[in-house]
């Protein structure tokens, strides 16, 4: 049984992430969307909120589960018996970073391979940070994230604005 881990902050998960996850779920017996718990990083949503949003987004994919990790991703992957890390590539700049990380990860955990999936062209310019910025200014993000996440973004920024007033 091949277990693959797709790690990211997912703050929030986007349609680009979900496209990669859906395609990766067809390649491996089990896919774990691993939400990075990074207390030192300023994130819009808590780890628990991100996990809940992702679970709702991938409920239709039977071999996908969602978990959180706070260690090195290679340590987490080995701990759960994974042999593959999944990464999505949007552009050449992503490739450079992922190429370096794949080599570092392989050095740290030689039994782990990295598989990169090219982003669907509809999502090559899509990022969580761009979605957050659009949402922060009241823009429509409904074509970039599932409806429940668009609503959560709207509510998060309304709450943020109300607390600043």
From Swiss-Prot:
Q: Which cofactor does it need?
A: Mg(2+)
Q: Where in the cell is it found?
A: Cytoplasm
> What sort of enzyme, by top EC class, is this?
transferase
Residues noted as binding ATP in the record, renumbered to the chain: 9-10, 17, 88-90, 98, 123-129
Tell me its EC number(s), please: 2.7.7.3
Look up the record and give one Gene Ontology term from the biological process aspect: coenzyme A biosynthetic process
Q: Which UniProt keywords apply?
A: ATP-binding, Coenzyme A biosynthesis, Cytoplasm, Magnesium, Nucleotide-binding, Nucleotidyltransferase, Transferase
Q: Describe the reaction catalysed, as an equation.
A: (R)-4'-phosphopantetheine + ATP + H(+) = 3'-dephospho-CoA + diphosphate
Q: What SUPFAM superfamilies does this protein's entry cite?
A: Nucleotidylyl transferase (SSF52374)
Question: MF terms per GO, please?
Answer: ATP binding; pantetheine-phosphate adenylyltransferase activity
Explain the purpose of this protein: Reversibly transfers an adenylyl group from ATP to 4'-phosphopantetheine, yielding dephospho-CoA (dPCoA) and pyrophosphate.
Subunit record text:
Homohexamer.
Instruction: Family membership, please give it.
Output: Belongs to the bacterial CoaD family.
Q: What is this protein called?
A: Phosphopantetheine adenylyltransferase
Q: Tell me what organism the protein belongs to.
A: Herpetosiphon aurantiacus (strain ATCC 23779 / DSM 785 / 114-95)
Q: Species lineage, top-down?
A: Bacteria, Bacillati, Chloroflexota, Chloroflexia, Herpetosiphonales
């Amino acid at each position: 049984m091949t277990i693959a881990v797709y790690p990211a902050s997912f703050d929030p998960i986007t349609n680009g992430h979900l496209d990669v996850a859906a395609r990766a779920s067809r390649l491996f017996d089990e896919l774990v969307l691993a939400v990075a718990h990074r207390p030192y990083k300023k994130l819009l949503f808590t780890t628990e909120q991100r996990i809940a949003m992702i679970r709702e987004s991938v409920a239709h994919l039977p071999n996908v589960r969602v978990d959180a990790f706070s260690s090195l991703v290679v340590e987490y992957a080995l701990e759960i018996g994974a042999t593959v890390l999944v990464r999505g590539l949007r552009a050449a700049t992503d490739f450079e970073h992922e190429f370096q990380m794949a080599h570092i990860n392989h050095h740290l955990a030689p039994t782990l391979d990295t598989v990169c999936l090219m982003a669907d062209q509809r999502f090559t310019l899509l990022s969580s940070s761009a979605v957050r910025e659009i949402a922060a200014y009241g823009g429509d993000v409904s074509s970039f994230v599932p409806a429940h996440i668009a609503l959560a973004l709207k509510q998060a920024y309304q709450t943020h604005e109300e607390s600043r007033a």
